[in-house]
């Protein structure tokens, strides 16, 4: 008997919605990364995108433990000399709710074409509303 290998046409991608209110950033990110990769499914195949679509609402209400809201720093660089900017978690959440969660999940996914396809299945919204009701996402508790 040979090893099972999922075919891309046979994979069913389900939709899930996660309410991130008062959840810890890293715990949500690790569970989301696992589900985007499809490792929770019995048909998981490393070279095939077997993951599900994840919609995260209330990302503006995410928490971090300890003093990380001030100590955790996110860096960007414009490409010009001296063009580095630093932003802490609190300021990033105030300006772009959900950006910290997107960066955390992206760091947990594989790099390359398959990983880039996986991150496109993540939809993050700062408020309680999302435009994906037509897909009938199931509630997922973390």
UniProtKB/Swiss-Prot annotation:
GO terms for molecular function: mRNA binding; structural constituent of ribosome. CDD domains: Ribosomal_L13. InterPro entries: Ribosomal_uL13 (IPR005822), Ribosomal_uL13_bac-type (IPR005823), Ribosomal_uL13_sf (IPR036899). It comes from the Bacteria. One of its GO terms (cellular component) is cytosolic large ribosomal subunit. SUPFAM superfamilies: Ribosomal protein L13. Gene3D superfamilies: Ribosomal protein L13. Transmembrane segments: none annotated. Keywords: Ribonucleoprotein, Ribosomal protein. Coiled coil: none annotated. Disulfide bonds: none annotated. GO terms for biological process: negative regulation of translation; translation. Signal peptide: none annotated. HAMAP family: Ribosomal_uL13. This protein is one of the early assembly proteins of the 50S ribosomal subunit, although it is not seen to bind rRNA by itself. It is important during the early stages of 50S assembly. PANTHER family: LARGE RIBOSOMAL SUBUNIT PROTEIN UL13M, RIBOSOMAL PROTEIN L13. Belongs to the universal ribosomal protein uL13 family. Part of the 50S ribosomal subunit. This is Large ribosomal subunit protein uL13.
């Amino acid at each position: 008997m040979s090893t099972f290998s999922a075919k891309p046409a046979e994979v069913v991608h389900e939709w899930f919605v996660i309410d991130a209110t008062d959840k810890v950033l890293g715990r949500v990110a690790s569970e989301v990364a696992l589900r985007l990769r499809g490792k929770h499914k019995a048909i998981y195949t490393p070279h095939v995108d077997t993951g599900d679509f994840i919609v995260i609402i209330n990302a503006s209400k995410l928490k971090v433990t300890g003093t990380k809201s001030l100590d955790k720093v996110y860096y960007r660089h414009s490409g010009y000399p001296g063009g580095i900017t630093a932003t802490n978690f609190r300021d990033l959440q105030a300006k772009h709710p959900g950006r910290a969660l997107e960066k955390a999940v992206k760091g947990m996914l594989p790099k390359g074409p398959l990983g880039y396809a996986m991150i496109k299945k993540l939809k993050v919204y700062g408020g309680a509303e999302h435009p994906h009701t037509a897909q009938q996402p199931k509630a997922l508790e973390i």
